[in-house]
Amino acid sequence: MDIGSKLKELRTKNNLTQTELGKRCDLTKGFISQIERNLASPSIATLNDILNSLGSNLKVFFEDWE
């Protein structure tokens, strides 16, 4: 699984739209969309902010990486 797909899975499990997630971590809907489609790569700090907004963290996110 790639970062974008895994983030999208987490976002949908949290019943959030891209817009709602973007507002939570001060990013645009467009940037969230680009990350989920693997067209953009977030910095570690940005990925951490997104994961915190989804109730997760970097350790858990990469723990069970396939």
Language-model features: where?
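Short, charged recognition helix plus adjacent turn
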Residues: 63-66
